[in-house]
From Swiss-Prot:
This is Ponticulin-like protein M. The lineage of its organism: Eukaryota, Amoebozoa, Evosea, Eumycetozoa, Dictyostelia. It is a lipid-anchor; GPI-anchor. It is found in: Cell membrane. Disulfide bonds: none annotated. A lipid is attached at residue 106 (GPI-like-anchor amidated serine).
Length: 131
């Protein structure tokens, strides 16, 4: 019984803390200019003269793509993968001159009702372990 309660508790907690998806980003290009963009949206950087960038996500990992054009229509001139650590926590790409701040997290897999049910199940499993 304790094994089953432990398993239910672990699965419930894992479901509650499953990865968040960040939907907005601020990109700082070496202090020269800062622009905000949304996930999967082509965004002009440094005004119309500076090209553009786009951030996409695949399996919890994000990818920054920089383009020479303002429409993201040619092959990316720079591509770099990164992970969002926390809301409003800046991530410096390996190149060192690009800082990305992940913003607007959402748990894309849970509705409030699902979260409440998982919390109740986890709480019940924890009580069962104590008995």
């Amino acid at each position: 019984m304790k094994f089953l309660s432990t398993l239910i508790l672990l699965l419930s907690v894992l479901a509650l803390v499953r990865g968040e998806q960040y939907n907005k980003f601020t990109v700082d290009l070496n202090g020269v200019c800062t622009n905000s963009g949304s996930l999967d949206t082509c965004t002009n950087q440094c005004g119309n003269a500076g090209g553009s960038f786009q951030i996409s996500q695949s399996g919890g990992e994000y990818q920054y793509e920089q383009y020479a054009t303002k429409d993201c229509d040619l092959m990316a001139s720079l591509t770099s993968k990164f992970a969002c650590l926390a809301d409003e926590a800046p991530v410096t790409l390996g190149l060192g001159n690009i800082k990305i701040t992940c913003q607007d997290p959402s748990n894309s897999a849970s509705s409030p009702l699902t979260t409440a049910v998982l919390f109740v199940v986890a709480f019940a499993a924890a009580i069962a372990l104590l008995l």
